[in-house]
């Protein structure tokens, strides 16, 4: 988690450089939710980086994971408040594209965090974990922890079709040495 928080802070600092002509750069951070501990830490890291660089951080999130409309509203509000750079963990990699296009048409830099958009070139940049590799590592850890003992593994896909979940899932199976659900 420290690495992701650090990457978020680095992205925030890079984004702030694009807005240095202003007295105080205005940067937005939109997460999937405000309750997930990962996104809470991401916001804390961004707030620390913004304070250190004298930037104003605006933050927003969907009400729940998957709330694209909430993310669109947050993006529109941030643009209206003068944000020149917005970092976002898109809840829906396709549905957010029209809002991103509008923002970029207004000269706002958009950086996707952790979850790529579809198409990937809809944003100016992507800072992300290698989610497949993360899944492989978790699968390998699980296999080692089981030490050859039989186990029944169940995986839940709360957001079917989301690339991050699919990559982690497939990596996990690979790390366990499984080729299918059988």
In which residue ranges do the predicted regions lie?
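A residue-level marker of the well-folded mature domains of exported/periplasmic proteins
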Residues: 3, 9, 20-182
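N-terminal signal peptide c-region/cleavage motif recognized by signal peptidases
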Residues: 16-18
């Amino acid at each position: 988690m420290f690495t992701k928080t650090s990457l978020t802070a680095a992205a925030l600092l890079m984004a702030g450089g694009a807005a240095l002509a202003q007295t105080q750069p205005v940067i937005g951070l939109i997460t999937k939710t405000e309750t997930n501990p990962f996104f809470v830490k991401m916001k804390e890291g961004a707030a620390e980086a913004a304070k250190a660089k004298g930037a104003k951080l605006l933050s927003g999130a969907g009400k729940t994971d998957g709330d694209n409309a909430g993310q669109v509203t947050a993006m529109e509000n941030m643009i209206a408040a003068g944000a020149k750079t917005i970092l976002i963990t898109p809840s829906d990699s396709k549905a957010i594209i029209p809002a991103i296009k509008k923002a970029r048409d207004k000269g706002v830099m958009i950086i996707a965090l952790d979850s790529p958009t579809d198409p990937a070139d809809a944003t100016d940049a992507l800072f992300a974990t290698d989610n497949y590799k993360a899944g492989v590592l978790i699968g390998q850890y699980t296999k080692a922890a089981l030490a050859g003992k039989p186990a029944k593994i169940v995986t839940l896909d709360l957001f079917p079709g989301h690339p991050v979940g699919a990559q982690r899932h497939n990596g996990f199976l690979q790390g366990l040495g499984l080729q299918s659900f059988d």
